[in-house]
Amino acid sequence: MQFIDQACISVKAGRGGDGIVAFRREKYVPAGGPSGGDGGKGGEIVLQADSNLQTLLDFKFKKFIVAQDGRRGGPNKCSGASGKDLVLKVPCGTQVRHQTTGIILGDLKHHGEILVVAYGGKGGLGNAHYLSNSNRAPEKCTEGKEGEQWLLHLELKLLAEVGIIGLPNAGKSTLMSVVSSARPKIADYPFTTLIPNLGVVRKPTGDGTVFADIPGLIEGAAAGVGLGHEFLRHIERTRLLIHLVDAAAARPIEDIAIIEKELFAYGHSLMNRPRVLVFNKKELLNEQCLQKLQAEARAFTNRDIIFISAATSEGLDELLKNVWEKLEI
């Protein structure tokens, strides 16, 4: 399935139905009188969060969305039927804003949560409303109002408590596949992961925590190089970051600095987000190299440092224990 995390759509709520001019003509109503009914209200356009959806793909080809108009009024003061509301399902984590003003209309985070993005027009009034002592047979009625029409920008920001970040080929997908039920694509070349992957990791209590494997970031990501800016938005909502580093890389400390620089450049308080520094592929280094790397990392940062092997599962218990403790703070 193609992963689409942004969409621009035009929405138009239904127009209100017109009121009508009508009069009582029954022979048993000798006085007659106006009986024109009101028009029905136009249908609204509603967005609803659905936890079964993971992408905005449905809106890739659905660019112009129109709700049903209200029906015109009828005789005998019968109101026209209101237009049917149009409910559009979106993934949990979808933020909605006006395309032109940038104003955020809402943030749909929880399953079933709804947001009305375009209100239907009011129905017009029938001539029964204009009966007065001076006008016993009014010929006046009003038209229904147009429904609201907006250009909206939908943006999906994944809802995960823990984000796994790092340069390409650091082993993020392998780690995700080991600690969760997710099965991301894994291969020994950079940029294997091209979309964020979500997985549920079980705590010792049995409760689930959502982890997000963010595709590999590169230098300049915060400025839009590669797809970095597209991916960085998905860690805005996380409570904790696992910064995964390839311990066997040529310059692992420089690799750490690259990601730190991108987090700072992107902003959104990512630099202040709690995180743990994790060196992966420890099985490829001897004890002397591991100690040297740990000393260099200690000189670079005061964050918790953990060495693991996602391939052999060594160190994963220590990592998850650290994660659970940080999430409890």
UniProtKB/Swiss-Prot annotation:
Residues 1-159 form the Obg domain. The keyword Magnesium applies. The keyword Metal-binding applies. GO terms for cellular component: cytoplasm. One of its GO terms (molecular function) is GTPase activity. It holds the Pfam family MMR_HSR1. SUPFAM superfamilies: Obg GTP-binding protein N-terminal domain, P-loop containing nucleoside triphosphate hydrolases. Mg(2+) binds at residues 173, 193. Gene3D superfamilies: GTP1/OBG domain, P-loop containing nucleotide triphosphate hydrolases. Residues 160-328 form the OBG-type G domain. Its EC number is 3.6.5.-. Its cofactor is Mg(2+). Monomer. Belongs to the TRAFAC class OBG-HflX-like GTPase superfamily. OBG GTPase family. This is GTPase Obg.
